[in-house]
Amino acid sequence: MKVVILMALLVLTAHCVPVSRFPGKIFLYCPFFNRKHCQRFCEFFKICRKPPLSRRTTVVPSFPLTTEADLSLTGGPLTPDRRGDSR
């Protein structure tokens, strides 16, 4: 049974390339033909990286967007005063 599991692991990782950006940890890049197989393998073993084209590049803000923050930043009504009025 152990031999079968080891052979299956070797077959699945035959196309994986080790990534050396993270010293001390082993991460594998899996260029399988089917992306679902690679994702399942990576999620199961937690040792694979996603291919570079499928990574997210958008940044999600880590703070809550509330109206109270907007009111505290302005400090008052947004109407022009005498000094800022251009006549």
Curated annotation (Swiss-Prot):
Write down the Pfam families for this protein, in alphabetical order: U9-ORF
Signal peptide positions are: 1-16
Knockout-associated phenotype: Following high LPS dosage to induce severe endotoxemia, knockout mice display significantly sustained sickness responses and reduced survival of 33% in contrast to wild-type mice which show acute clinical signs that peak at 12 hours followed by recovery and survival in 86% of cases. IL6 levels remain elevated at a significantly higher level in knockout mice at 24 hours compared to wild-type mice where levels peak at 4 hours. Minimal intrinsic effects on macrophage function.
In which broad location class does this protein mainly occur, judging by the first location in its UniProt entry?
Answer: secreted
Record key words, sorted: Glycoprotein, Immunity, Innate immunity, Secreted, Signal
Gene Ontology terms: cellular component: extracellular space
| Induction and repression of expression | Induced in macrophages and dendritic cells by TLR activation in a Myd88- and Mapk14-dependent manner.
GO terms for biological process, alphabetical:
innate immune response
Where does it reside? Secreted
Tissue pattern of expression reads: Expressed at highest levels in lipopolysaccharide (LPS)-stimulated bone marrow-derived macrophages and thioglycolate-elicited peritoneal macrophages with minimal expression in other tissues at steady state.
Q: How is it modified after translation?
A: Glycosylated.
Give the superkingdom in one word.
Eukaryota
Q: Please give the function described in this protein's UniProt entry.
A: Plays a protective role during endotoxic shock.
Its protein name is: Endotoxic shock protective protein U9-ORF
Record organism? Mus musculus
Q: What is the lineage of its organism?
A: Eukaryota, Metazoa, Chordata, Craniata, Vertebrata
